[in-house]
Amino acid sequence: MATTVKVLAKELKRTAPDLLEQLKAAGIEKGSEDDSITEKDKTVLLEHLQKAHGSTDTGARKKITLIKRESSEIRQADSAGRTRTVQVEVRKKRVLVKAGDKAPEEVAAQPVKQVAPAAPAKPVISEEELEKRAAEATRQAELLARQEAEMKAAEEARQKEVTVPVVKEVAPVDKAPVAPAVAEKKLAADKAAKDLAASKEKELADIRARRAAAEAEALAIRDMMSAPARVLKAPSEVAAEEAKKGTLHKPAKAEGAEDKKKAATKVGGKTIKSSETSSTWQEEGTRKSGGLKTRGDTSGGVGGWRSGGGRKKQRQIAEANVDTNFQVPIEPVIRDVHVPETITVAELAHAMAVKSAEVIKLLMGMGQMVTINQVLDQDTAMIIVEEMGHKAHAAKLDDPDLDLGTEGHDAELLPRPPVVTVMGHVDHGKTSLLDKIRTAKVAIGEVGGITQHIGAYHVETPRGMITFLDTPGHEAFTAMRARGAKATDIVILVVAADDGVMPQTKEAIHHAIAGGVPLVVAINKIDKPEANSERVKAELVAEQVVLEEYGGDVPFIPVSAKTGEGIDALLENVLLQAEILELKAPKEAPAQGLVIEARLDKGKGPVATVLVQSGTLKRGDMLLAGSSFGRVRAMMDENGKPCNEAGPSIPVEIQGLSEVPAAGEAVQVMPDERKAREIALFRQGKFRDVKLAKQQAVKLENMMETIGEGAIEAKLLPLIIKADVQGSQEALSQLLMKLSIPEVKVQIVHAAVGGITETDVNLAVVSKAVIIGFNSRADAAARKLAENNGVDIRYHNIIYDAVDEVKLALSGMLIPGKKEEITGLVEIRQVFLVSKVGAIAGCLVVDGIVKRTSSVRLLRDNVVVWTGELDSLKRFKDDAKEVRAGVECGLSLKGYNDIKEGDQLEVFEVTEVARSL
């Protein structure tokens, strides 16, 4: 595909007219956006732009350097006659210069300047450190100057020793013959003086170079010492690598260099290394050997791979390293550990940079036996982190939910209808009041006359549209009422004028206050003769609901759901509260809402009642609700009529989710299925991990208590609950779990919405459970399977009946209670001792009746001495089954002979009594 002006402008992120102007300025004539551009045109344009911006480098290569390396081996014999192989590397370098530049010979003829290695970047240091370094450098300079002076004095003394004796030995001779000799000696002396001056100058230059090297080395060492402890690479390593690439830049080794390296000067009681001593201690052994090394350090030096002197030598080297190497003091590292909701022991140890054994040891000290793969909950993990001295932060790492809720913030906010929840005690007339407003007959269709679902309706009134949520009033539906208060803007509190404030009325008040929702009180049933509105007002004030007529802000409207009295005033007050709240929501945005209710329909699949809170929900949208997701296949309003979209504050029934969502879950429209699936799977895994971690924590906490108290095995009543909607299933499960006591417990094996299927029956067979169908029925296959396997299925449509039946079943599982009843009193008149039998008591039955099977207590001075059973009971010589009051008898006690005259026997019987919850 040919490149056009338009395509190039798009790649350069510029407009086509601007690019045409630049091409014209570069001398390239292009008439329109569709003209093609060649690579040559691009190069010309690039050079023009570089010149226009002041760049001298046109990007073209002017010089190419080719380096060729050749390696070979030569064999060389030493003085002992042994041959060794030396590797020789020859480097050939060729420079290719672009036409118009200097020739390679001219370039080669120029002297090569020695490029000084770049100084390592110095870290930022404080003024105190600068002063210390300056003092150290001054001291080093003084020591070197003193050393230089001493060497100079020694040289002068040596010169005097050489020259003075020669002068003394010369004999006096005649001037004429001596003149040529004197001239020669003078020339020789001048030459020697020049040589001496040159050598002194050379020595001084050498001393200066060594002093500079020593100062640089000292500065480098101090920089290394003051550098942070975790520096991985010394700054001087770059220069060292450059130095290793060639050998031409190294100076020739001077004579006596080894002596200079070993020499040290003592000044002030301190030993100072020679200035040529390198700070790289591992190369010291290599320098001492003086031989050619082709494979690194093989001389047995500190870093060598040959042992050199055996284990003793290695031990000495290791001890030398310990004594000379600088050890940075280690401080405890305090880490910020982000702890998610669940984390394994291994992950927690990795986050703290410790071994897993340390964490397991600490947990064992806290009474928890765990493995490295054990999942810990967030609270336990944070305690472990703090115990080990780190900082723990509760976090939700890698949570895709964090990306949600960012769409639609810039949309225009428009007024929306208020969402009004009707709350109150059971049978106070909430649904009847809504029926009167909607002119419908919902309450008549409710089983038992009570509401067991959340009903969502929107009503068109002359003053505007209102969305109503009708919540159950029975105590079992606390969670439903909490969800209703969460989704609402205004709460209508219905109180019966003849009944007053009841427990669920108080609970509704608490829900409204906790949610910060304004209240409107409707006193219902004012048409009844026993209605007492004043008593209701006083009870409401006692519950911190101050009415307007008492100086508060809560409207108070007497209404009658039967006659319709006060309905208009109630709606007017509701709309007035809505105007004060200024309720607004974006309409042209992805929908967000709340699951009010959910159920599993056999033909439609998962069905959810959703209240749209913002945006517009359309048919075909990808929806995410908790851990379930799916595309909206169908939408229906509260009357069962299909609809294509729903705006803010509109309740709709949707189909198409992957599973039944939990009631109260947030609903949001997602851009695509991939994102929705990712978040749903993440939530499923997180819910499972959190649940398992909490179960494990409870098991670990109760393990020692169970061992200490002794395991009391409770009887279990396994149940499988199938309900029509999520809210009813949730309420029934919670209510049945509350029936559990230590002796008998309710075990809910499975709870779900929908009809009873063969899967449920098979699960009941395995777990020996009873199936409770609440407003749901079993299909034909499930009924047949249940009959064949003896599975008990109970159907209920009123929550009271289900609870009562389970309570009765639990009562039947209780161990019967024992009741003791005193049936008679016997007085011992005489005691007979009979061999082989024991003591026989002659008695008189004072009160009641004595039976042969009765249990007795022996009383002595009204104190119980013994409790047991009768061994025999006789009347004269005959055995008797029972003896009544006023009759004498003889009896013996089983296993007890310590009977005395005057003792009494208390006769009693123990009977079993059925217990109930």
Swiss-Prot record:
Residues 524-527 are annotated as: G4. InterPro entries: DNA-bd_dom_put_sf, EF-G-like_DII, EFTu-like_2, IF2_assoc_dom_bac, IF2_II, IF2_N, P-loop_NTPase, Small_GTP-bd. PROSITE patterns: G_TR_2, IF2. Residues 449-453 are annotated as: G2. Residues 470-473 are annotated as: G3. Keywords: Cytoplasm, GTP-binding, Initiation factor, Nucleotide-binding, Protein biosynthesis. The keyword Cell division does not apply. Its main location: cytoplasm. GTP binds at residues 424-431, 470-474, 524-527. NCBIfam families: IF-2, small_GTP. One of the essential components for the initiation of protein synthesis. Protects formylmethionyl-tRNA from spontaneous hydrolysis and promotes its binding to the 30S ribosomal subunits. Also involved in the hydrolysis of GTP during the formation of the 70S ribosomal complex. This is Translation initiation factor IF-2.
